[in-house]
Amino acid sequence: MIASKFGIGQQVRHKLLGYLGVIIDVDPEYSLEKPSLDDIAADDSLRTAPWYHVVMEDEEGKPVHIYLAEAQLGYESFPVHPEQPTLDELAESIRLQLQAPRLRN
């Protein structure tokens, strides 16, 4: 079993670029498409570690869906981001949906 560092609804930062993001899904390993031989790195531990579907904002403040390796993400220490309130709202909405029981007919 592969353990992930981050959970759905958690806010994270891109380690190199510093962008704030919200995790919307987690894959136990890279699963978008099979990489070609040219794309295979010498160390495939990156592909076999968790990968995350993350929503970030572009320069205009529009949401962008990005697929990132766990090694590319860091913890976010601030709970509120006045410069990016929509990401705060998204994270809170996801967390509330995960906590709320669903009604079944």
Curated annotation (Swiss-Prot):
<dbReference type="GO" id="GO:0005737">
    <property type="term" value="C:cytoplasm"/>
</dbReference>
<keyword id="KW-0963">Cytoplasm</keyword>
<protein>
    <recommendedName>
        <fullName>Heat shock protein HspQ</fullName>
    </recommendedName>
</protein>
<dbReference type="InterPro" id="IPR011722">
    <property type="entry name" value="Hemimethylated_DNA-bd_dom"/>
</dbReference>
<keyword id="KW-0346">Stress response</keyword>
<dbReference type="InterPro" id="IPR036623">
    <property type="entry name" value="Hemimethylated_DNA-bd_sf"/>
</dbReference>
<dbReference type="GO" id="GO:0003677">
    <property type="term" value="F:DNA binding"/>
</dbReference>
<comment type="similarity">
    <text>Belongs to the HspQ family.</text>
</comment>
<dbReference type="GO" id="GO:0009408">
    <property type="term" value="P:response to heat"/>
</dbReference>
<comment type="function">
    <text>Involved in the degradation of certain denaturated proteins, including DnaA, during heat shock stress.</text>
</comment>
<dbReference type="Pfam" id="PF08755">
    <property type="entry name" value="YccV-like"/>
</dbReference>
<dbReference type="InterPro" id="IPR022866">
    <property type="entry name" value="HspQ"/>
</dbReference>
